[in-house]
Amino acid sequence: MELLKQLYQIHSLSGFEKRMGKFIRRWIRKNVPDAICQTDKLGNIYVTRGKAEDYPCLASHIDQVQKTHSEDFVCIESKDIILGYSPRNRRQEGLGADDKNGVWIALKCLKEYECLKAVFFVGEEKGCIGSSAADLTFFEDCRFVVQSDRRGYKDLVTNIGWNELCSREFLADTEYEKFGYQPHDGMITDVGELKERGLAISCINLSCGYYEPHSDEEFTVKKDLLNCLALVRHIIENCTKIYPHINNSDCFDDEREYMHWEQYDEMSIIIDDILAKYPNVTAECLKEYYGIHYDMLTLEEFRQLLNEAKENIVEPGVLEEPIPFI
């Protein structure tokens, strides 16, 4: 787990990922010297190892949400979990395990497999900035793309909103059940952005063992991370053909409208719960915490939802602590 803890030690706030990118490139040069590593103008890193007609491909993102990362930040590792801590400030601090866990999996596999592609995106937490401008020709000889960027331990994301990510054949061939995974709908991430841009191969996003993401209470359960790595290895070794997939939606605009109102309704429930406990919360604060995953809602809609929810408050309270990420 030494490499994982080295990744956790690097603060890589969205928009300030250069240090992480430099670490990844140096690590690859030292540990996978035969790999070809290229970086685009945004900072996305594209890695190809070996020569083959087609490649398995892994994706991850190198930015994180947490703004606090003290100079004395350390990783505390127990038998089951890893968390971040500042001894001087006597407080827990976020690891950035979303998505350093995915970066770790990709680096481990690059070292292990002689023919593999991997891509490390910038700016995922700010709306998939890197993947929205990524070079799609990099994926032309890929069999599939697997991203490890989901909280928990059992989700295999096959749909993001109404955007299907993979073929049934690929899903079956992954044999995900052997590893305790289940198909699940997910939220915006890089493979979803690639599919929206027209990537015509199967993609999935896997739970990779981090919990309480985007918060200072974030932690990693090691056995869940290792189980994700085991599934990724299994897919690389057993899914040895190209798995084409095109999301043919004739009613995309209608689906997006439905998704928008679905997000609106979900956020209405969330704000009701939040406001009952934190009556001083602002629309700007809600947008900052939830806007990444409720990306179809505008700031004005957050204001509207907040005003509607205020009418339902029974007992006002006092905002004494940060809003927990849901």
Named regions from a protein language model:
Residues L3-Q6, I10-E53:
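A non-catalytic alpha/beta surface segment that caps or lines the substrate-entry region
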Residues K30-T39, E77, I81, E177-P183:
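Short secondary-structure junctions
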Residues T48, A52-C115, E125:
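Active-site metal-coordination/substrate-binding segment of hydrolases
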Residues Q182-C228:
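Zn-dependent metallopeptidase/amidohydrolase metal-coordination segment
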Residues E212-N280, N307-P324:
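His/Asp/Glu-rich mid-to-C-terminal helical/loop segments that flank catalytic regions of hydrolases
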Residues P279-E301:
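Acidic, low-complexity, intrinsically disordered interaction modules
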